[in-house]
């Protein structure tokens, strides 16, 4: 069963591409026709590609790995922040910091700096600074929160990158490709899909179109997270059951020893009887 359908995408305007003169020929396989100088995306292919991408993202989430979402364009920022925060995945909706992937250790240091400032505030160290120093530190903390707050829990490189606008987020895509991180993306008719591993042909400018695609993607990731949770619970129950059986096995050992001893005693008694009978015959 598809995660979304043709009509839902149609109502969201996901089929509207860019002007014909702005098109990228490499998107030709995903274009249905041209109408009034605008390319129309083949939504049947969008449904297929969206399902393919969603299933792959589900498996990534199920394995316990993270997907980093990138959408800094105005139409997508609020939608991405709301929907992705709800499923607990990291996201970037402000400026993409150069080296966020290729220079990840430095980014982690900046995130840790933010945590250090919080710790100073909580333990009272912050009170020892002058008013001017407090103001500078507060501004620094606010800037870090704005740019890196949404990836604070990303302790290692993500397993995949999801991009809403390939052209606008070209730097993020380049960094991901350098590190062999698979890229999932909404790709409009004016974009080059060459570096995208999972192409989702769709209008990346309309808010409704972006929301529909993200709903399907977030739904798949949520499924993966839920299945992982259930598997862990099942594993924990099996471990508890196994631990519960362990004492029973220990208790069984004395009974086995007693049974063996009784068997040996019986054999010895039988031998004694045979010996006694033999001695009587000899007499």
Give the ranges of each region predicted by the language model.
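Ribosome large-subunit tunnel/peptidyl-transferase-proximal elements
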Residues: 1-233
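Intrinsically disordered, compositionally biased charged tails
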Residues: 1-3, 226-283
